[in-house]
């Protein structure tokens, strides 16, 4: 346990941020998985609908600093390519 007051506070804020980031990353993984399942099933309409919502979640996570902007761009690109193959 830290002795310095500011470090005690940083431990608390880091834990709160970790839990928040964990939640966002979990929802991202779920969104990507559901898109991939729709794409694998060949459901064009549902896949395109999920592509939009997943892209939005990726952009939001990148703007909040949960994931790097380049990682979001790479994932969006891969998902778009998968959608275009349908």
UniProtKB/Swiss-Prot annotation:
InterPro entries: Ribosomal_bS20 (IPR002583), Ribosomal_bS20_sf (IPR036510). It comes from the Bacteria. GO terms for biological process: translation. Keywords: Ribonucleoprotein, Ribosomal protein, RNA-binding, rRNA-binding. The keyword Transferase does not apply. Gene3D superfamilies: Ribosomal protein S20. GO terms for molecular function: small ribosomal subunit rRNA binding; structural constituent of ribosome. GO terms for cellular component: cytosol; small ribosomal subunit. PANTHER family: 30S RIBOSOMAL PROTEIN S20 (PTHR33398), SMALL RIBOSOMAL SUBUNIT PROTEIN BS20C (PTHR33398:SF1). Belongs to the bacterial ribosomal protein bS20 family. Binds directly to 16S ribosomal RNA. NCBIfam families: S20. This is Small ribosomal subunit protein bS20. It comes from Rhodococcus erythropolis (strain PR4 / NBRC 100887). The gene is rpsT.
């Amino acid at each position: 346990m830290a002795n310095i007051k500011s470090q005690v506070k940083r431990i608390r804020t880091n834990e709160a941020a970790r839990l928040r980031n964990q939640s966002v990353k979990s929802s991202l993984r779920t969104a990507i998985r559901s898109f991939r399942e729709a794409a694998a099933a060949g459901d064009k309409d549902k896949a395109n609908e999920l592509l939009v919502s997943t892209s939005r979640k990726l952009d939001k996570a990148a703007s909040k600093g949960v994931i790097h902007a380049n990682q979001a761009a790479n994932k969006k690109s891969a998902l778009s390519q998968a959608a275009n193959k349908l």
